[in-house]
Amino acid sequence: MRLYRDNAVVLRQHKLGEADRIVTLLTRQHGLVRAVAKGVRRTKSKFGARLEPFAHIDVQLYPGRNLDIVTQVQTVDAFATDIVDDYTRYTTACAILETAERLAGEERAPALQLHRLTVGALRAVAEHHRPCELILDAFLLRAMGFAGWAPALDDCARCSAPGPHRAFHVAAGGAVCVQCRPPGAATPSPGVLDLMDALFRGDWASTEQVPEWLRGQASGLVAAHLQWHLERQLRTLPLIERARPHAAVGVEDSVRQDGDRDSTTRTPSSA
């Protein structure tokens, strides 16, 4: 079989034997690829450091039956240098990588848009020109859009009645009108859905003066919407929430609900 070359982001890695590692890559043309990097744990390895998580690389691989084999690596962007020494940046970048892997779909399914989005998000976190929570929420909203899970933020998610609407219900698909509003719908503060829409569209100018408590409400809704569709919580989000207490995933402390059940949670039988 012929060698192939692709642009990739290293999502994660784990040990294999005494000297090798298995790396999970999000590639531009081949989607998720799992490959063996032989000998990279040896001190004299010529490309071991280039295969650390957060790395943006140009990689050459040899197709294998179950796992491909890394034969050559060149660094495109060493994002880890500006990420790993800062807790907030590190946990944000970890959430980006975990989400990218979960939303990439089957192995080798092309994921050009998600790859481009992931590289851009890691670059934004590394450069730190904008708050990490806004970068993460923008990434999550757009990644959900690629997966077909984008929340309705203006028109009603159920009947398409023109908005804006005040209520938000994850199971319904986002913003809902008065007629369609189900029990347990959340009522975020004015401006929360506008912020989410601005992040989805990349309208960064509209996000600059948004207060932190309002960002927290938006973050809670974004995370809850994602986790509803994934049907289980991302491992990395609680780490971010401890650093950013206003953005609790349950959002019950910062968003008013109708009834006894929060629209952003599942019952045990429905998870």
UniProtKB/Swiss-Prot annotation:
Does the record bear Phosphoprotein in its keywords? Answer: no
Query: What parts of the sequence cross the membrane?
Result: none
Does the keyword DNA repair feature in the UniProt annotation? yes
Query: What are the UniProt keywords, alphabetically?
Result: DNA damage, DNA recombination, DNA repair
- Please provide, in alphabetical order, the Gene Ontology terms of the cellular component aspect for this entry: bacterial nucleoid
Basic and acidic residues composition-biased segments: 253-264
Any one Gene Ontology biological process term?
DNA recombination
InterPro entries documented for this protein: ARFGAP/RecO (IPR037278), DNA_rep/recomb_RecO_N (IPR022572), NA-bd_OB-fold (IPR012340), RecO (IPR003717), RecO_C (IPR042242)
- Name the segments for region: Disordered: 248-271
Give the matching NCBIfam families.
Answer: reco (TIGR00613)
UniProt xrefs under PANTHER family: DNA REPAIR PROTEIN RECO
Q: What does this protein do?
A: Involved in DNA repair and RecF pathway recombination.
Q: Which family does it belong to?
A: Belongs to the RecO family.
Protein's name in the database: DNA repair protein RecO
Q: In which organism is this protein found?
A: Rhodococcus opacus (strain B4)
